[in-house]
Amino acid sequence: MQGKIVQLGKDTAVYGLSTILGRLINFLIVPFYANVLLPAENGVISNLYAYIAFAFVMYCYGMEAAYMRFVSTLDIGDRKQNFTVPFLSLFTTSILVSLAIHFQAPFISRCIGLNTSESGLIQYAGWILCFDTLSVIPFASLRMERKAKVFASLKLFNIVTNVALNLVFILGFHFRADGVFLANLCASAAT
């Protein structure tokens, strides 16, 4: 019993510290954006990330919780089936919805108050959602297998990659708001 409590404490510390560190790193990039990008660009970035947060919930449609429930009890199927079914479901719907977003980006841009010239940002957002969704079940699997250090390392790798690519794209290649989303897309695809 005491061993399980100690293990829970260690896992909680790893998950908690990695989450806090990740948020701190992401928080530190906000002043960079404020000093390098125009206020209008920061507004577009903020609005689009708000839409991404809402859309991510719909992209995942509760599959992470369902996966964790079924894999913890194995009421139906074995571990492999309990991984494959939700992953393929999310894979299929993510690809289809992201393709729809990609091809309807000018229309979506107008609907949310962006210029059609900014429809590339919508396309980036659609693919960010796709790649982030594809990582949901593998990350849940790491949690269920109690691989907290691997989980935290991959999450931090994603954040550090995102921040580093932001610096490269914005400072090195002089991208604007598109550099923010391209960096996020590359980081999401890498993890």
Give residue spans per PLM region:
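N-terminal membrane topogenesis motif
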Residues: 1-27, 83-84, 88
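Transmembrane-helix boundary and interhelical linker motifs in polytopic inner-membrane proteins
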Residues: 2-6, 37-39, 55-90, 108-109, ...
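Small-residue-rich midsections of specific transmembrane alpha-helices
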Residues: 19, 25-29, 46-72, 90, ...
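Residue-level recognition of pore/gate-forming positions within transmembrane alpha-helices
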Residues: 19, 23, 50-53, 90, ...
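Helix-terminus/linker motif at the lipid-water interface of multi-pass membrane proteins
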Residues: 25-41, 109-112, 168-173
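Interfacial/gating helices of multi-pass transporter permease domains
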Residues: 30-54, 118-120, 177-182
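Short membrane-interface helical motifs at transmembrane helix boundaries
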Residues: 96-114
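Hydrophobic alpha-helical transmembrane segments
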Residues: 122-126, 152-191
